[in-house]
Amino acid sequence: MVQAGGNCGMHVHKFVEHFDTIYTFEPDPLNFFCLVNNLPYSNVIKIQGCLSDENKLVEIEKPYGDIGSIRINKNVKQGKIPCFTIDELKLDHCDLIQLDIEGYEMFALRGAKETIKKFHPLICIEYVHFQHYGTDNKEVDNFLFSNGYELVAKYVTDRIYKYVPFNLRIS
């Protein structure tokens, strides 16, 4: 499993018993400190950084002043926080990608193209704030639909997509 927007570990804590290995990403130093202390599990690999479609260094900001709304500052060209791609993890398997990264989900999905094609994981994303980075919900949907995914559930601001082979699609 790959999870981004780890915050203080609340989401990951719920997944620990269900996945052999969980990679969780959190860029904010204070949140990451809490995450490390809240998740002492050996199957959780904690990475202080962001997910993107390329390796780079970024700055983060808290536009609303709270620890749950951290996002990449698009006005700063180079920062101190590393970005990684999911594909570079070279996973042996991946059953779930869960992204809550304040509108940067499309970039993380682009950086997971090979992982998505190889493993067809369930994908759960927060479905808001895309416009901050020049993307939108249509771009996210088109990317997932073109890779064989269908929307299977909505919960508040989250969307869950499941891979369905083209030959098994009804529509």
Regions found by a protein language model. Name each.
Residues 1-171:
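Phosphate/nucleotide-binding beta-alpha loop and adjacent structural elements of enzyme active sites
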